[in-house]
Amino acid sequence: MTDLPASVRWQLWIVAFGFFMQSLDTTIVNTALPSMAKSLGESPLHMHMIIVSYVLTVAVMLPASGWLADRVGVRNIFFTAIVLFTAGSLFCAQASTLDQLVMARVLQGIGGAMMVPVGRLTVMKIVPRDQYMAAMTFVTLPGQVGPLLGPALGGVLVEYASWHWIFLINIPVGIVGAIATLCLMPNYTLQTRRFDLSGFLLLAAGMATLTLALDGQKGLGISSRWLAGLVAVGLAALLLYLWHARGNARALFSLNLFRNRTFSLGLGGSFAGRIGSGMLPFMTPVFLQIGLGFSPFHAGLMMIPMVLGSMGMKRIVVQVVNRFGYRRVLVASTLGLAAVSLLFMFSALAGWYYALPLVLFLQGMINSSRFSSMNTLTLKDLPDDLASSGNSLLSMVMQLSMSIGVTIAGLLLGLYGQQHMSLDAASTHQVFLYTYLSMAAIIALPALIFSRVPDDVGTNTVIRRRNRSGS
C-alpha cells in the first residue's frame, strides 16, 4: 500500500478515523450507564434506551446510506456523517435529562449509520482492485481497536472526570475529520437507480415501532392502548412491505433472497443469535458495578479480555469451521455461549473474581466464532446479483437484533428488579441471577435454527470476494 499516492493514503486515514469514532462509541457508553443514571436522577433500569436509540437509528438508516453516497457523492455524505455524529456528541454532553440524551443519541446514530458503509464505498472507489484487501485491512484496524479501548477509556473518564467527557472527546476528532474530508476527499458519484423510498419508510416504521413496543408500558410511560397501537402499526408496516416488495424489481430488499435456504437460515439465526449476544456488552458492566460494587474503571478493564478473545479467535475461525462445519460450530458455540454466561454469573456471585477475566476471554472467543460463522453462512451461497442486497439486509438485521437484545435485557432487569435495585446485596444478586438465567435461555434458543443447517464438514467456507459487498 506504500506505492499509493500520498493523497489516497490521507483519504484512507480519514476513513480509518471515521471507523474508529463509530466503533469507540458503541462500547464507551456501556461502562458509564450507572454513573449516567445517578447524574440524571434515573433508575439504572431505564438507561438501556441510551444504547437502543443509537443502535436502532443505525439499523433504520443503513439501507439509505450507500444510495445517498452514490447519488450525492462520498465526500458530501461522509462530511455530513461526521458533522451529525459530532453535533450529536455535543448535544449528548449537554443533556440534562434522559429524554434529551436519547434524542441526541438518535442524531449520533444517523451520522454513525452513514460513516462506516460510506467509508467502505470510498475505499472501493479510490484504491485499485488489487490493493483493496490491504486498504480495507488498514482502515478497519482502528475499528477493531475502538471496542478494545472503549470500556476502559469510558471507565477512566467517568471515574476521574465525568460521563460527559465520553462524548466531548469526539468533538475535536470530529472537527479535524470534517475539515480533512472537505480538503482531501474527492466527491465520487455514480449513476443510481431510483431509491425505494416507500419500502424504506415501511421497514423503518416497522422496526422502530416494534422495538419500542418491546420496552413496555413502564419504559415508555404510555397506556396499554397506545402500546397495542404501536404493535399494530409495526406489524402492518412489515406486512405492507412484503406486499410492496412482491414482484417489485426495485424493492429495497428483494424477496428473492429468501428463496435461498442457506440465506434464510443464516439470516434467521443471525437475528435470533445477536439478540442474545447483544445483551452481554450491556449487562456485564451494569452487573459488575451495581451487583458487585466495581468502580467504573475496574468494570471497564474487565471488558478488555472479552474484546481480546474476540480478536484472537478471528485468526483461526476459518480453520475451525473448515474442520467441523457450520452446523456443529454454530450449535456448539451457541450452547457454549449460554453456558459461559452462566459460568460468569456463578463465578461472580461465588466471589471468584480472579476467574472473571478468563471467563470473559472465553466468552469473547465463542462470540467471535458465532459472528464470523453466521455472517459467512448467510452470504456464501447467494448469486452475484443478490450479494449486495443480501449483505445490506444482513447489516441492517445485525444492528436491529442488537437493539432488541439490549431492550429485552433492560426489560428483564425491570421485570425482576421492580425498581428495587438499591436494596441489600442479596436481593440485588437475586435480581441479576434471574436475569442471567433468562438471558442464557434466550442465548441458547438459536441452536434450534442452526441445527437445521446442512452438514458441510470438509467444504471450503471462504466467501469469494464480491464487488459491492460491505463485508
Curated annotation (Swiss-Prot):
**Per the record, what is one GO cellular component?**
plasma membrane
Spell out the subcellular localization from the entry: Cell inner membrane
Species source reads Klebsiella pneumoniae (strain 342)
Q: Could you tell me which HAMAP family the record lists for this protein?
A: MFS_MdtD
The entry's protein name is Putative multidrug resistance protein MdtD
One of the entry's Gene Ontology molecular-function terms is: transmembrane transporter activity
Q: Identify its membrane topology class.
A: Multi-pass membrane protein
- Residue ranges crossing the lipid bilayer per the database entry: 12-32, 49-69, 77-97, 106-126, 138-158, 165-185, 195-215, 220-240, 263-283, 286-306, 342-362, 393-413, 431-451
Ordered alphabetically, the record's keywords are: Cell inner membrane, Cell membrane, Membrane, Transmembrane, Transmembrane helix, Transport
Question: What InterPro entries does UniProt report for this protein, alphabetically?
Answer: EmrB-like, MFS, MFS_dom, MFS_trans_sf, Multi-R_MdtD
What CDD domains has UniProt attached to this entry? Answer: MFS_LmrB_MDR_like (cd17503)
The UniProt entry's sequence similarity note says: Belongs to the major facilitator superfamily. TCR/Tet family.
